[in-house]
Regions:
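Class I (Rossmann-like) S-adenosyl-L-methionine-dependent methyltransferase catalytic domain
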Residues: 1-50, 59-107, 126-133, 147-212
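A short acidic, Gly/Pro-enriched loop at the edge of an enzyme's catalytic core
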Residues: 107-117
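Conserved acidic functional residues
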Residues: 64, 111, 121
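A short SAM/SAH-binding and catalytic strip from SAM-dependent methyltransferases
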Residues: 116-129
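Class I SAM-dependent methyltransferase core
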Residues: 55
Length: 213
């Protein structure tokens, strides 16, 4: 059987003890989560104000809080029930639907229903086969002309177990990710490496891919 995720990784993220500051600790390279949103994310998706947005793997809702203001309707979906529970506690009725999934599909989200699919700080840890399955599902749920904003790993040549690599990054290259997108009849709009500030050993490990159906 093909392995889609490591059960130990699932248990890791479903443990309340690792979320020391509800995930905001992972915004430290940008100063604050608000800085991360304003400097790395907002300009790329501001055109989707008042549109339908799906967020994959929201964690404890640190970016979700901003997406909920931007979107007319926001759906969040996560493998881990704890993440859905905490995001719901944080945002309540400001999110249209809170869904759990199997870690590779978007069951519960209708075909051709979303203007934007978004994910930050989650695909960086996903095995390539998980990413590939999600890209197939993103094609299914996006409206024609809709876009996806996916923050993913740019680390290639490490261990197949992402937890053995620096910062838990998965094996993935921009070319491999582009192949997944094009194989599903979508096109890459841009691929932008993230420059962490201050400069540190994480530079060159992540990229943001924006693609369109």
């Amino acid at each position: 059987m093909e392995k889609f995720y490591n059960i130990d990784e699932q248990k890791f993220w479903n443990n309340n003890d690792i979320w020391l500051d509800s995930g905001h600790e992972w915004s430290s390279s940008f100063g604050t989560t608000e800085n991360l949103w304003n400097k790395e994310i907002f300009d790329s998706i501001k055109e989707f104000r008042g549109k339908k947005i799906l967020e994959i793997a929201p964690g404890f809702g640190r970016i979700t809080q901003f997406l909920s203001i931007l979107a007319s309707e926001l759906i969040v979906i996560d493998l881990n029930p704890l993440c859905i529970e905490k995001t719901k506690e944080k945002l309540g009725h400001h999110v249209l639907a809170y869904l759990t999934n199997d870690g590779k599909t978007l069951t519960g989200v209708r075909d051709n229903s979303q203007d934007l699919v978004f994910s930050f700080d989650s695909f960086v840890h996903m095995h390539a086969n998980v990413t590939e399955e999600y890209v197939k599902e993103i094609f299914r749920v996006l409206k024609p002309g809709g876009q996806a904003f996916i923050h993913h790993s740019w680390l290639y040549g490490g261990s197949e177990n992402s937890f053995d690599n620096s910062a838990g990054r998965a094996n993935m290259s921009p070319e491999q990710f582009k192949g997944f997108v094009e194989n599903n009849n979508m096109r890459i709009v841009s691929q932008t490496p993230i420059q962490f500030k201050p400069l540190n050993s994480w530079n060159g490990m992540d990229t943001i891919s924006i693609f369109q159906k």
